[in-house]
Curated annotation (Swiss-Prot):
<dbReference type="GO" id="GO:0003988">
    <property type="term" value="F:acetyl-CoA C-acyltransferase activity"/>
</dbReference>
<dbReference type="InterPro" id="IPR020615">
    <property type="entry name" value="Thiolase_acyl_enz_int_AS"/>
</dbReference>
<comment type="function">
    <text>Catalyzes the final step of fatty acid oxidation in which acetyl-CoA is released and the CoA ester of a fatty acid two carbons shorter is formed.</text>
</comment>
<feature type="active site" description="Proton acceptor">
    <location>
        <position position="392"/>
    </location>
</feature>
<dbReference type="GO" id="GO:0006635">
    <property type="term" value="P:fatty acid beta-oxidation"/>
</dbReference>
<dbReference type="InterPro" id="IPR020610">
    <property type="entry name" value="Thiolase_AS"/>
</dbReference>
<keyword id="KW-0808">Transferase</keyword>
<dbReference type="InterPro" id="IPR020613">
    <property type="entry name" value="Thiolase_CS"/>
</dbReference>
<dbReference type="GO" id="GO:0005829">
    <property type="term" value="C:cytosol"/>
</dbReference>
<keyword id="KW-0442">Lipid degradation</keyword>
<dbReference type="Pfam" id="PF00108">
    <property type="entry name" value="Thiolase_N"/>
</dbReference>
<dbReference type="InterPro" id="IPR016039">
    <property type="entry name" value="Thiolase-like"/>
</dbReference>
<comment type="subunit">
    <text>Heterotetramer of two alpha chains (FadJ) and two beta chains (FadI).</text>
</comment>
<dbReference type="InterPro" id="IPR020616">
    <property type="entry name" value="Thiolase_N"/>
</dbReference>
<dbReference type="InterPro" id="IPR012806">
    <property type="entry name" value="Ac-CoA_C-AcTrfase_FadI"/>
</dbReference>
<dbReference type="InterPro" id="IPR002155">
    <property type="entry name" value="Thiolase"/>
</dbReference>
<keyword id="KW-0012">Acyltransferase</keyword>
Length: 436
């Protein structure tokens, strides 16, 4: 069992989140087609700094993530510093925790703030599913290395003669778990079957997500936290997410065929999050530094937790594992929360985690706890929709959720919010936020 671990520095400062921003999220190969993640990252960080009017030298560290990495820019964080006019002496490094990458980036900046090595930093993430590192076969890669070391033309030709046509085919990024060979959708199908989640339930959650996201845009709730993106060569712009289907009906969802288990499956493209391009970032400071600069924080980070489970069966249970730990460290219960925002990788995964958060048996047998974490109140859950509607640029989603939840907490007069996500590799993340 854990204990209450308040995120307060030795000087008594809380960890303040002073602002957050994201690009609109775009479906793969649409508005951001051809724009690499590093450029999306520069776009959002540059605009975040401009809007905040915080002097660049105030930011002492930038931690950024990218899940689908480009070989030519392996440290996306440093490229963002150099490409946005920030102080060249700003510390910058990159992290990856699959779909929880920007949660990790935030945690790393928080650790620096808690240690006292910095007083302000930026955390975030960017991903592009439209600009991908296309590789070569292992055999071709080995031959190319050997050719580079060959001394004569005859040696080079002999090496190339070993290749067959199939060896020359490009190799796209893997979509399956390295350790198991399972795709994320295969795991979602596992979870639907394990926990008895029907196709109708999944479609209903997906429909709810789109309806609520569309309403959030219609009500103007997202305008402040989503920038307008001007797309090179700057003849077009994108001001809103382009995946949201506000006019869809449940009948539309029912028309789609299963995408993974073709014969007996229930997971479809419509009740899953789509491949997406986008970037998001937040500025964090110690509470006293924010006061010195005359800034009113969006809110504060009260606690966080990361967990890991086995990858072979139902591995997308991160929220069910990490949430009780984050709540315990915050000294709170589910009943104390004003809002709950859970990453919707798949409707099946989301519904399974909701089910297990309220399960006494899961708490006892899996978590070793005496009582269930708590039932999820639908009136508090993903009130503005979730990733199924907005999309999911892997490394950007956590920062989107944090910013979105804090803004909504402030609209409701303050309170506590939980943001939580599953991630590839059986990983989970949860953070408890506070707004006044």
């Amino acid at each position: 069992m854990g204990q209450v671990l308040p995120l307060v520095t030795r000087q008594g400062d809380r960890i303040a989140i002073v602002s957050g921003l994201r690009t609109p999220f775009a479906r793969q190969a649409t508005a951001f087609h051809g724009i690499p993640a590093v450029d999306l990252g520069k776009m959002v960080v540059g605009e975040l700094l401009a809007r905040s009017e915080i002097p660049a030298e105030v930011i002492e560290q930038l931690v950024f993530g990218q899940v689908v990495q480009m070989p030519e820019a392996p440290n996306i964080a440093r490229e963002i510093v150099l490409g946005t006019g920030m102080n060249v002496h700003t510390d910058a490094y990159s992290v990856s925790r699959a779909c929880a990458t920007s949660f990790q980036a935030v945690a790393n900046v928080v650790e620096s703030l808690m240690a006292g090595t910095i007083r302000a930093g930026i955390a975030g993430g960017a991903d592009s599913s439209s600009v991908l590192p296309i590789g070569v076969s292992k055999k071709l890669a080995r031959v190319l290395v050997d050719v580079n070391k060959a001394r004569t033309m005859s040696q080079r030709l002999k090496l190339f003669s070993r290749l067959r046509l199939r060896d020359l085919m490009p190799v796209p990024p893997a979509v399956a778990e390295y350790s198991t060979g399972l795709r994320m959708g295969d795991t979602a199908e596992q979870m639907a079957k394990t926990y008895g989640i029907t196709r109708e339930q999944q479609d209903a959650l997906a429909h709810r997500s789109h309806q609520r996201a569309a309403q959030a845009w219609s009500d103007g709730k997202l305008k402040e936290e989503v920038m307008t993106a001007f797309i090179p060569p700057y003849k077009q712009l994108l001001a809103e997410d382009n995946n949201i289907r506000g006019n869809s009906s449940l009948a539309d969802f029912a028309k789609l065929r299963p995408a993974f288990d073709r014969k007996h499956g229930t997971v479809t493209a419509a009740n899953s999050t789509p491949l997406t391009d986008g970037a998001a970032a937040v500025i964090l400071m110690t509470e006293s530094r924010a006061k010195e600069l005359g800034l009113v924080p969006l809110g504060y980070l009260r606690s966080y937790a990361f967990t890991a489970i086995d990858v072979w069966q139902d591995m997308l249970l991160g929220p069910a594992w990490s949430t009780p730990l984050a709540l315990e460290r915050a000294g709170l219960t589910m009943a104390d929360l004003t809002l709950i925002d859970m990453h919707e990788a798949f409707a099946a995964q989301t519904l399974a985690n909701i089910q297990l958060l309220g399960s006494e048996r899961f708490a006892r047998e899996a978590l070793g706890r005496a009582h269930a974490t708590g039932e999820v109140d639908d009136s508090k859950f993903n009130v503005l929709g979730g990733s199924i509607a907005y999309g999911h640029p892997f490394a950007a989603t956590g920062a989107r959720m944090i910013t979105q939840t804090l803004h909504e907490l402030r609209r409701r007069g303050g309170g506590f919010g939980l943001v939580t996500a599953c991630a590839a590799g059986g990983l989970g993340a949860a953070m408890v936020l506070e707004a006044e």
